[in-house]
């Protein structure tokens, strides 16, 4: 995993510059051992995006950690020095995005938005419509938005 990450990162830096690299990752199927996550942390990764529901596995997190993740909107593994954030808004699954946005805003949770490439190809209009709703709502908000 680390070798692949370093190779991809090297090429991305060559093409786009180091400042454009993501500091939060979403690993395939949310798989990553504590050891592997620690190695990525040493490469500059600050955190990881988790599954949209507590029922799904997310990396090495146990039930107590997942409970904190979903009740607080984030989980910080202080020992390892990495953060975990739920992927609250999965564009291809959202039917009522406004309701979920209201919930996140009231709770003051980070707004994490995600979609798969295949979903854009399957229903481009729905995906972009959902993204527009999120961006419009965020632009209307008066609180400061932090980008990772």
Language-model regions, residue ranges each:
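Helix N-cap and loop-to-helix transition residues
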Residues: 1, 33, 147-148
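Well-ordered, non-membrane alpha-helical segments in soluble/globular domains
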Residues: 1-11, 93-100, 125-138
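A structural motif corresponding to the C-terminal end of an alpha-helix
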Residues: 11-21, 137-144
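Active-site-adjacent pocket scaffolds in enzyme catalytic domains
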Residues: 19-112, 125
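C-terminal domain-boundary segment and adjacent tail
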Residues: 46-53, 107, 111-148
């Amino acid at each position: 995993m680390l070798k692949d990450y370093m190779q991809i990162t090297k090429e991305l830096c060559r093409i786009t510059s180091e400042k454009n690299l993501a500091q939060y990752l979403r690993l395939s199927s949310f798989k990553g051992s504590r050891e592997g996550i620690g190695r990525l942390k040493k490469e500059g990764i600050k955190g990881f995006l988790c599954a949209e529901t507590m029922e799904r596995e997310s990396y090495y997190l146990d039930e107590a950690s997942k409970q904190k993740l979903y009740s607080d909107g984030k989980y910080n593994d202080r020992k390892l020095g990495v953060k975990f954030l739920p992927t609250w808004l999965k564009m291809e699954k959202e039917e009522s995005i406004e309701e979920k946005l209201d919930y996140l805003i009231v709770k003051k949770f980070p707004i994490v938005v995600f979609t798969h490439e295949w979903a854009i190809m399957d229903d481009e209009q729905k995906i972009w419509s959902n993204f527009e709703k999120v961006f419009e709502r965020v632009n209307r908000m008066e609180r400061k938005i932090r980008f990772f």
